[in-house]
């Protein structure tokens, strides 16, 4: 199976070089020993004078065929297709007439026994490699979606992809599926907004109100109301974080433990109540405008909102129940349990900060990167656990035998030292005293730097790619929204002009009558 000289024979194949694919490195995939003569039997380079110009002999028809893909010609023996009978090229051998051949390829030259396929010749290079050597690779410069279409066209299953390429291929397909799903949701919202403007006046007014509410709540860049709503939401989140920090001051905590409430404590409670009221109103507005209530309640950001809002109301109920059960001379066990529950619930208010992900592209990128890099984070955790399990017992034995250090009392205590040392934090609460212990500490520091650098590079590239995708998607949504508004305004102007025209005509008719 070789490239024939002739038309497009000077095609630049440097872009299709497999040297840019890191999966060919022996560390990733050990190469099998080549069988001498196999490639010569499966594909043979033809000289210029050997190219069939007027016709070919009958024995050549039975022995070899010519494949023309996008102007690039390949010659291969029929025996090569015996191993792939279910592929599109393998089906050529089962064709018995001209109509069967045209059902498989785009055209056929009887004189030269040449089959034409109007496909991308660059993508066919990987198909050629698979038919020739049995290795299916996805080049880094090739689009995964185009490659998927080529596999479907040539009848080659995705399972033939090597492990390294298949993982990257499935990741690209998954990212594209997520992007298509988000675009379909936006299209559904836009179509619902267009359908809501029906002929009935009441339905049209309700639909317009819902569309404006959706733009204000879910689309900050849709207009001034959306920007104001987003700014208010961010402001209340900031006020909540500051109010939570102020409520932990020692003076306020002492008053709370003693059962007293000063003016400052009362002000903190009022600020918290106002913020929770705003968050509750925002949650209700999002619930009202959601097309699918079940999908809205199932989303991660909605769950975060519920976990952050409910503790306030639960605290009020628990305080009321505790006040009802408080009796003179009764034990404090119940009140202690109630106080513990209240402290845990109040600590959950810090989840309000996660609400900023609705309005921050950076936080959305961080969440998307964490979801896409679960494997890298797992590798990082595995590296750290193995290194910690190695250095902690070693330092414990050295320090207890040679320095009798009081800090390293047990191996679990040394685990804490190993974590702090390998992450290069270095609190200084546990310091090795002996020279061998300091050598172990140095080895731990260097190992931590190297081990954390390996997955971080991949995570950084994923973060950059995710940020670029979300930014392009946001720009695309804004552009589509602007086009939709322009189209809507033009339709309204046309309808108003028609109403004026036909309205004047109908009035003239009434006057004549």
From Swiss-Prot:
Region (Disordered): 184-204
Side Cytoplasmic, residues: 1-224, 290-300, 360-374, 468-513
One matching Pfam family: Ion_trans
Stretches assigned to the Extracellular side: 247-267, 322-338, 397-411, 432-438
Non-spanning membrane segments, not crossing the bilayer: 412-423, 424-431
GO molecular function annotations of the record: potassium channel regulator activity; voltage-gated potassium channel activity
Localization terms from the record: Cell membrane
Motif (Selectivity filter): 424-429
Tissue: Expressed in brain and placenta, and at much lower levels in kidney and pancreas.
Biased segments, Basic and acidic residues type: 191-204
Membrane-spanning segments: 225-246, 268-289, 301-321, 339-359, 375-396, 439-467
GO biological process, one term: action potential
Alphabetic keyword roster: Cell membrane, Ion channel, Ion transport, Membrane, Potassium, Potassium channel, Potassium transport, Transmembrane, Transmembrane helix, Transport, Voltage-gated channel
First-listed, main subcellular location of the protein, grouped into a coarse class: membrane
Coiled coil location: none
PANTHER family membership: POTASSIUM VOLTAGE-GATED CHANNEL SUBFAMILY G MEMBER 1 (PTHR11537:SF88), VOLTAGE-GATED POTASSIUM CHANNEL (PTHR11537)
Complex formation: Heterotetramer with KCNB1. Heterotetramer with KCNB2.
Reported function: Regulatory alpha-subunit of the voltage-gated potassium (Kv) channel which, when coassembled with KCNB1 or KCNB2, can modulate their expression and their gating kinetics by acting on deactivation upon repolarization and inactivation during maintained depolarization. Potassium channel subunit that does not form functional channels by itself.
Domain remarks: The transmembrane segment S4 functions as a voltage-sensor and is characterized by a series of positively charged amino acids at every third position. Channel opening and closing is effected by a conformation change that affects the position and orientation of the voltage-sensor paddle formed by S3 and S4 within the membrane. A transmembrane electric field that is positive inside would push the positively charged S4 segment outwards, thereby opening the pore, while a field that is negative inside would pull the S4 segment inwards and close the pore.
Family, similarity comment: Belongs to the potassium channel family. G (TC 1.A.1.2) subfamily. Kv6.1/KCNG1 sub-subfamily.
Protein name: Voltage-gated potassium channel regulatory subunit KCNG1
Name of the gene this protein is made from: KCNG1
């Amino acid at each position: 199976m070789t490239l024939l000289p002739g038309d497009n024979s000077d095609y630049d194949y440097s872009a299709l070089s497999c040297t840019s694919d890191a999966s060919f490195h022996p560390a990733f995939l050990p190469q099998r020993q080549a069988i001498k003569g196999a490639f010569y039997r499966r594909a043979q380079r033809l000289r210029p004078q050997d190219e069939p110009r007027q016709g070919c002999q009958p024995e050549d028809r039975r022995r070899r065929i010519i494949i023309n893909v996008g102007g690039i010609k390949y010659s291969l023996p029929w025996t090569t297709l015996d191993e792939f009978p279910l592929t599109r090229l393998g089906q050529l051998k089962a064709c018995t007439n001209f109509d069967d051949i045209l059902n498989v390829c785009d055209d056929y030259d009887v004189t030269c026994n040449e089959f034409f396929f109007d496909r991308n010749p660059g993508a066919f290079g990987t198909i050629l490699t698979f038919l020739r050597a049995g290795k299916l690779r996805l080049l880094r410069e090739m689009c995964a979606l185009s490659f998927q279409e080529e596999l479907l066209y040539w009848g080659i299953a995705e399972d033939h992809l090597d492990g390294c390429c298949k993982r990257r291929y499935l990741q690209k397909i998954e990212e594209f599926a997520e992007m298509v799903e988000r675009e379909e949701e936006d299209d559904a919202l836009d179509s619902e907004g267009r359908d809501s403007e029906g002929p009935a006046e009441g339905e049209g007014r309700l639909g317009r109100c819902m569309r404006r509410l959706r733009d204000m709540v879910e689309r900050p860049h849709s207009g001034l109301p959306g920007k104001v709503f987003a700014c208010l939401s961010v402001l209340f989140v900031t006020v909540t974080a500051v109010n939570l920090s102020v409520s932990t001051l020692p003076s306020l905590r002492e008053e709370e433990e003693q059962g007293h409430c000063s003016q400052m404590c009362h002000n903190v409670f009022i600020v918290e109540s106002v913020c929770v009221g705003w968050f509750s109103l925002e949650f209700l507005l999002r619930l009202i405008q959601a097309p699918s209530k079940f999908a809205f309640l199932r989303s991660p950001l909605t769950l975060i909102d519920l976990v952050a809002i409910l503790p306030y109301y639960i605290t009020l109920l628990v305080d009321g129940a505790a006040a009802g059960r408080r009796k003179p001379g009764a034990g404090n066990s119940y009140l202690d349990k109630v106080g513990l529950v209240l402290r845990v619930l109040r600590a959950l208010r810090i989840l309000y900060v996660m609400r900023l992900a609705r309005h921050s592209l950076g936080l959305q990128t961080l969440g998307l990167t964490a979801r896409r890099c679960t494997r890298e984070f797992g590798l990082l955790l595995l590296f750290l656990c193995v290194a910690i399990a190695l250095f902690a017992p070693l330092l414990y034995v050295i320090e207890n035998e040679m320095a009798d250090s009081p800090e390293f009392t047990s191996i679990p205590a040394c685990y804490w030292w190993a974590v702090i040392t390998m992450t290069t934090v270095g609190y200084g609460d546990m310091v090795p005293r002996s020279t061998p212990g300091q050598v172990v500490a140095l080895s731990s520091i260097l190992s931590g730097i190297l081990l954390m650098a390996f997955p971080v590079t991949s995570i950084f590239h994923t973060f950059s790619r995710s940020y670029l995708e979300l930014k392009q998607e946001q720009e695309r949504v804004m552009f589509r929204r602007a086009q939709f508004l322009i189209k809507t305004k033009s339709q309204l102007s046309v309808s108003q002009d028609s109403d004026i025209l036909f309205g004047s005509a109908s009035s003239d008719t009434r006057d004549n009558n």
